[in-house]
């Protein structure tokens, strides 16, 4: 099994979920996150102003951009399809398109039924 973690633009989350659902991958976790790439900020994108004074002083010149992070666990043989599908929806060719991480998952357990392994994620 693989965990696919994708950090994408907020305006791409709905289409990404639709495509993954159409492929049979509807189980996922989605979060609103803030972050930045090596460019520190992207001109034209909204930045997140930190309200807490202590954190703001530590922030310095760094500005954080709102993003969405989705995470889903899929069988090994489906990882490439999921990654390619996420890329197809989210690639604009511009800085800020996002990142996709693919991580190995040793095991999974469905709490309600005690199913484990791929049975717990399918």
Swiss-Prot record:
For this chain's UniProt record, which GO biological process terms are given? nitrogen fixation; regulation of nitrogen utilization
Name of encoding gene: glnBB
Q: What is this protein called?
A: Nitrogen fixation nifHD region GlnB-like protein 2
PANTHER family cross-referenced by the UniProt entry: NITROGEN REGULATORY PROTEIN P-II, NITROGEN REGULATORY PROTEIN P-II HOMOLOG
> What family is reported?
Belongs to the P(II) protein family.
Function statement: Could be involved in the regulation of nitrogen fixation.
Q: Give one GO term, molecular function aspect.
A: ATP binding
Q: GO cellular component terms? A: cytosol
